[in-house]
C-alpha cells in the first residue's frame, strides 16, 4: 500500500494495487477492487479526511494500477515505450470522477500486434469503468501536434512518467521545454487569450448562481493557468515551487493554496453527489453538497453560506490570477522595457495604460491615498488598470488597515468626489469592487460580497447585481442607448444630482441577507451614510426614500391594475413629486435589467412607461381623474378612428350600447376601434378571435368574442400554456348579451411578441376551444426538475380597496405548468368572476394579481375569500416535488 493511503485514518483502507496478485487483475475482481476504492474515497471524505489527501491517494492508486497492468500486458518488453500521465492526471489531481488522461509514447510506430495489445489494454480500463482519455503517438508526432495545438502542448508541459522507458520521456521533456517549442512569450500570450475566451463564455464573472467550479472565472482553471505559465517558464511543478522562482510571495502562495484547497473540497463533494463527471454547481445539487460539507442553518441558509464562501474564494483567485499574470508579463518577460513612465501627479505615474505608485510605502503611510488613486483613475480616461506591483502594495495595505476607510474624513470627501464624477462607475467603482476596496471602505459592502439568493430569479450575487445596476445607470448618459431605454436616456441627464441616484443604487440591496425588511434596513443605512458623507437632510432623505421604495414602481406596474385611476392616485400619493418619480424610474429600470439578463422585455418597459406618464399627469393635474370624462374621451377618439374607415355608425351604436362602462374605461381608443372594426362586420352570435399584428405593450394582444360559459378563461389559458405562450395580462369583460370580450397579452418564451407564422395556428386552436361545448381539463405537464428543489408556499392575499364592486387578490406560488388554468377552474367552480389579471413570473415563483367579483358584481365577502384562499393553497402547493 502507498504511504499516502496507509497514513490516512479512514474506514477500512482498501487493498493497494501494488499488492494485487495476478488473480486480482482479472476483469471482475479488478472492477470490484475499483468499486471498493471509490466507496472508500466517499467514506473517508465523510469521515473528515481532506480532499487533498484523497486526491493524492486516488492518483497513487491509479498510478499503481496502471503500472501493474502495464507489466501484465508485458509492455515493459517493448523498447522505447512509456506510459505518461497528462492533463489533470499529470498534475496528480484526480477527483473521484476525474478523467484519466494518458499518453502512450513510442520511438517508432507500433506494430499491428503491439497496437492490438494496446487496444485491449485501453478496453479493459473502460470495462472496469475508468474514464480514460488516451492517445498513442511517437515522439515526433507529439512534438508536431503540440506545435500546432495549444491544448496538446499544455498536456505535454505538465506530463508525468508513470512507467516504461524513462529515456524517451526525458527526450520529450527536453524538446517540450526547449526554446523552439512554444517559447515562454508565445505560450503566455496564447494562454492569456485562452483564459479571456473562457471567461467570456461565463459572462466574465464567477458570480453566476450556477457556476462551473473548474472553468468559471476564479475557478480551478485560473489556478492552472498560473501553474502552466510558471511551469513553462521556470519548470516549477507546484504552487510551492513558484515561490522559489520569485513568481509569488510566501503569503500569496499560502492564499493560493487555501483557495485551491477550498475549491478542491467543493469539487470532490460535487463528484460524490452527482456520481458522474460534472463541475457545475447546479441548483438541484447545491443543497446536497452544502450538507455534505457541513453547512447548517434553516431553509436555504446552508446553500447561501456555502455559495458565499465559494464566491469570496473565487474573487481571491481572480485577483491573484490577474495580478500574477500581469506581474509575469511586466517584470519577468520584461515586455516593452523601453516604455517610460509618465507622471500623473506627485503620487502616481502612468506605465503604459496602468497607474503606478511613485512611493511604494504611500498606502501604508496614508491609507486615504488608496481613494486618491481611484479618483485619479476616474479623472484620467487613459488609465485602464493598476500596475502589478502597485496591486501588491494595495493588497497588503488593504489587509493592514486599522479601521474602515470611511472613518477617515479625507477618504469620505474623495468618495463623494468619485461619486460625482461622470465616469465614476466604470473607472472607479468597478475596480474598487474588483480589488475589495469597497469592502475595505465600509463593512456594509463587505457583508454583501458573495451573498447569493437560492432562487431562479436573481442571476447574480448581491454585490455583483449592485455593480451591474450602477453600470446600467451610467449607461443612461450615453445617447447610443436611447433605442433600448428611451425614457431613461431622456431623464437621466436632467437629474439635478445623479450622484444621489448612484448612492441609492449602492445601498438598495445593502441589507440583503439580514433579518428584516431589506428595504427598510437599507434605507436606515443609506440615511446614516449620506449624512456622514456631508449630504444635507434633503439630499439624504431622497437617497433613503429611493432605497426604501426601490421596489415600489416595479411592484405597482407588474402586480397592480395601473388602468385603475384609484391605483394611480395611491401611487402618486407615495411619490409626491416629479423629482422622485424621475429618480425612481431610472433606478427601477436599472434594477430589473441587472437582476437577470432575461428579465427585461418590451412588456415590462411598456408597463413602466404607462405608469410613469400616468403618474406624471396626475402630479401635474393635482386632482382625481373623472371616470366619466375618461370614458367619453375614449369613445370619442375611437369613433374618430372608425370614421376614417367609414364605419356603419348604426351598427356601432348597437354594439357599444350592449357594453358596460368598464369596457370603455379600461381600453384605449385604438383597442376600442380595433374591436369594433371587426365586430360590426361579424355575426354577433358567432365566435371571433383577433390577434394583433403589431406589438401591444410589448406583447401580442389576443381578443376573444364568444358566448360566455364557466371555465372559459381556464380553457383559453390552458391552450395558450400548451402552445408554450406565457400570459402576462388579461382583461375579462362580458357584455349585456352574455358575450365575452376578453383580452390576453401573450409573449413567446424568449420574451418577444407572438411569431407571425404562428398567428393562424393559435387563432384556430383558440377557436376550437371557445366552440367546444364543454371545457376540457388540460393535461398538466410534470413539474420541471429544476423547480422541484425550491419551496415556495402558496400565499393568497386580499388587498385593501375602496371599490365595493371589486376584490383585488394577490397570489404567490411555485411556478408550475397549467397554474393559470387551475386557478381559473377554481374561480368558475366557486362562481367567482374574473375581470382582470396581471401575471408575473419571477424565477421559480409566480406573483399574480387578479381583479375579482361575485355573481352579483360585488366584492367577495369574507366567507368566500377564506374558501378561495383555502382551495388555491390546497391545489397549488405541489405534491410531486420528489
From Swiss-Prot:
Domain spans labelled HD: 462-577
Domain of life: Bacteria
Name of the protein in its database record: Bifunctional uridylyltransferase/uridylyl-removing enzyme
Domain remark text: Has four distinct domains: an N-terminal nucleotidyltransferase (NT) domain responsible for UTase activity, a central HD domain that encodes UR activity, and two C-terminal ACT domains that seem to have a role in glutamine sensing.
Pfam families reported for this sequence: ACT, GlnD_UR_UTase, HD
PROSITE patterns: ACT (PS51671), HD (PS51831)
InterPro entries associated with the record: ACT-like_dom_sf (IPR045865), ACT_dom (IPR002912), HD/PDEase_dom (IPR003607), HD_domain (IPR006674), NT_sf (IPR043519), PII_UdlTrfase/GS_AdlTrfase (IPR013546), UTase/UR (IPR010043)
HAMAP family for this protein: PII_uridylyl_transf
Gene Ontology process terms (BP): regulation of nitrogen utilization
Its biological purpose: Modifies, by uridylylation and deuridylylation, the PII regulatory proteins (GlnB and homologs), in response to the nitrogen status of the cell that GlnD senses through the glutamine level. Under low glutamine levels, catalyzes the conversion of the PII proteins and UTP to PII-UMP and PPi, while under higher glutamine levels, GlnD hydrolyzes PII-UMP to PII and UMP (deuridylylation). Thus, controls uridylylation state and activity of the PII proteins, and plays an important role in the regulation of nitrogen assimilation and metabolism.
NCBIfam families documented for this protein: PRK01759.1 (NF002487), PRK05007.1 (NF003448), UTase_glnD (TIGR01693)
Uridylyltransferase as annotated region, ranges: 1-343
Activity regulation description: Uridylyltransferase (UTase) activity is inhibited by glutamine, while glutamine activates uridylyl-removing (UR) activity.
Catalytic activity: [protein-PII]-L-tyrosine + UTP = [protein-PII]-uridylyl-L-tyrosine + diphosphate; [protein-PII]-uridylyl-L-tyrosine + H2O = [protein-PII]-L-tyrosine + UMP + H(+)
One GO MF term attached to the UniProt entry: [protein-PII] uridylyltransferase activity
Region of interest (Uridylyl-removing), residue spans: 344-700
Keywords linked to the UniProt accession: Hydrolase, Magnesium, Multifunctional enzyme, Nucleotidyltransferase, Repeat, Transferase
EC numbers for this chain: 2.7.7.59, 3.1.4.-
Domain ACT: start-end pairs: 701-778, 808-882
Keyword Glycoprotein set for record: no
Gene3D superfamilies per the UniProt record, alphabetical: Hypothetical protein af1432, Nucleotidyltransferases domain 2
Family to which this protein belongs: Belongs to the GlnD family.
Listed cofactors: Mg(2+)
Native organism: Photorhabdus laumondii subsp. laumondii (strain DSM 15139 / CIP 105565 / TT01)
Keyword Lipid biosynthesis: no
Gene: glnD
